[in-house]
Amino acid sequence: MSTYKVTYSAYAKGSSTVASEGTMTINAESAYMAEQTLKAIFAGLEVIIRYTNNA
């Protein structure tokens, strides 16, 4: 398992209102899984992944 830092913005669906943005550190098997984990955390919001890298 590796540690990834995922930079993201989460918006209310159908809106330009930012609900959350920042960088989250996630332990996962791959960068893709780290991004999917972050999207699951913010289920119900539109999540844009800005950048993902190994921490």
Spans of features found by a protein language model:
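Short aromatic-glycine-(Arg/Gly/Cys) micro-motifs in beta-strand/loop hairpins
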Residues: M1-E21
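N-terminal compositionally biased, intrinsically disordered segments and leader/signal-like regions
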Residues: Y4, M24-I26, N53
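Acidic interaction surfaces
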Residues: G14, V18, A31, N54-A55
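Mature extracytoplasmic or otherwise solvent-exposed domains
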Residues: N27, A31-T37
